[in-house]
């Protein structure tokens, strides 16, 4: 299953790091890298119809494909054709959130959280306290 996604990414011009991808976990890790986010933005690669067959395994890595009513506190999460809420709190790491393919995400940022949002044909609303920062 993952081989088809890798082959399509190569055809669309993914960076050389795609050659190191052996699993959905390593694919999702690459997706959150600066190069991965740029590739996904430029090619609109993150689509439900392209990735639905890896949805269950992707969800184990906080990548939600075609899901509803998702609630997560993960520092890295992606929503692809999904709806959900991300609760961001604290300074342990920067929250990296990808919102793609008509997803809608509510982001709640508190307690000095730093949040980076990448929107690829998705929408999001942010509620934050005076300490949180959005990049």
Q: What is the role of each PLM region?
A:
Residues 1-101, 106-135:
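Short, glycine-biased loop/turn motifs at secondary-structure junctions and
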């Amino acid at each position: 299953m993952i081989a088809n996604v890798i082959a399509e990414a190569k055809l669309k011009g993914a960076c050389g790091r795609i050659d190191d991808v052996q699993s959905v976990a390593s694919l999702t890790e690459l997706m959150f890298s600066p190069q991965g986010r740029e590739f996904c933005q430029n090619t609109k690669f993150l689509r439900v119809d392209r990735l639905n067959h890896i949805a269950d395994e992707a969800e184990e890595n906080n990548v939600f494909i075609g899901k509803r009513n998702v609630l997560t506190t993960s520092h890295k999460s992606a929503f692809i054709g999904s709806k959900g809420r991300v609760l961001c709190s604290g300074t342990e790491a920067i929250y990296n959130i990808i919102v793609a393919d008509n997803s809608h995400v509510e982001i709640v940022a508190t307690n000095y959280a730093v949040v980076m949002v990448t929107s690829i044909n998705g929408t999001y609303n942010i509620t934050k306290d005076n300490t949180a920062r959005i990049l």
